[in-house]
Amino acid sequence: MLYLTKISNAGSEFTENEQKIADFLQANVSELQSVSSRQMAKQLGISQSSIVKFAQKLGAQGFTELRMALIGEYSASREKTNATALHLHSSITSDDSLEVIARKLNREKELALEQTCALLDYARLQKIIEVISKAPFIQITGLGGSALVGRDLSFKLMKIGYRVACEADTHVQATVSQALKKGDVQIAISYSGSKKEIVLCAEAARKQGATVIAITSLTDSPLRRLAHFTLDTVSGETEWRSSSMSTRTAQNSVTDLLFVGLVQLNDVESLKMIQRSSELTQRLK
């Protein structure tokens, strides 16, 4: 039985919860090998029994049988299309419709946000916010997509009165790192945690007595070992990707948390500065 085809064609027959299950299975069929009914139920906010009943409605004995059948169908389909379909990003191929691409991208980003927020140590995050709030000077380092995340954070921090350097040039990043002092903070953003330039800057900052805060993945890495504090980010992207989409989503969620936490710590003055910034930029229009 072609379950993927049956799921695609039976949309009008599904209840609200069944449609949630169908959408999830279609968007994540390439990753079902590692998905259990318990995980799926938790992510979708439904009961495990709803998933079992959905599988039985399609003609399978239970979720395990449906999952294995879908994996088999997906593998067979991939073998047929691999000769012509180009792999564009993670599980997205050139044969996917824009609607399927949208679902896959949205789910990838949703998972990055959910998993990153679930794994954050919020007591550690509060401590990091307090450390940053007392820093005379903050340096933010990053490369590529991580540099974009860093630049966004630097703008936010400057808006509420922090002295921040966030340079794109790696030579300048290294130069700033060696001039940091005790009490200063370096926020190093690198998902891999192994980029030579970022590790070099972290080493220099630590040597000068600055506090190094790494926004990185859970994987053991040189940056993770160097950092005084780490904030973990999770991304489901594979090595085969066209851009760090869900990685940036996870990183932005962490940097936005830092910003809002700092605003909350000094709410009256921060809000005054945000208001003044808004008034000044309005005058430029």
Swiss-Prot record:
Annotated region of DNA binding: 37-56
Occurrences of domain SIS (ranges): 128-268
Pfam families in the cross-refs: HTH_6, SIS
GO biological process: carbohydrate derivative metabolic process; N-acetylmuramic acid catabolic process; negative regulation of DNA-templated transcription; regulation of carbohydrate catabolic process; regulation of DNA-templated transcription
InterPro entries: Homeodomain-like_sf, HTH_RpiR, RpiR-like, RpiR-like_SIS, SIS_dom, SIS_dom_sf, Tscrpt_reg_HTH_MurR, WH-like_DNA-bd_sf
Gene Ontology terms, MF aspect: carbohydrate derivative binding; DNA binding; DNA-binding transcription factor activity
Disruption phenotype: Cells lacking this gene show an abolition of the extensive lag phase observed when grown on MurNAc and a 20-fold enhancement of murQ transcription.
Highest taxon of source: Bacteria
UniProt induction comment: Repressed by itself and by the cAMP receptor protein crp.
Keyword set, alphabetical order: Carbohydrate metabolism, DNA-binding, Repressor, Transcription, Transcription regulation
Pathway: Amino-sugar metabolism; N-acetylmuramate degradation [regulation]
Occurrences of domain HTH rpiR-type (ranges): 1-77
Miscellaneous comment as given in the Swiss-Prot or TrEMBL entry: Neither GlcNAc-6-P, GlcNAc, anhydroMurNAc, MurNAc, nor muramyl dipeptide have an effect on MurR binding to the operator site.
NCBIfam families per the UniProt record, alphabetical: PRK15482.1
Function of the molecule: Represses the expression of the murPQ operon involved in the uptake and degradation of N-acetylmuramic acid (MurNAc). Binds to two adjacent inverted repeats within the operator region. MurNAc 6-phosphate, the substrate of MurQ, is the specific inducer that weakens binding of MurR to the operator. Also represses its own transcription.
Record note on quaternary structure: Homotetramer.
The protein's name: HTH-type transcriptional regulator MurR
Organism, as annotated: Escherichia coli (strain K12)
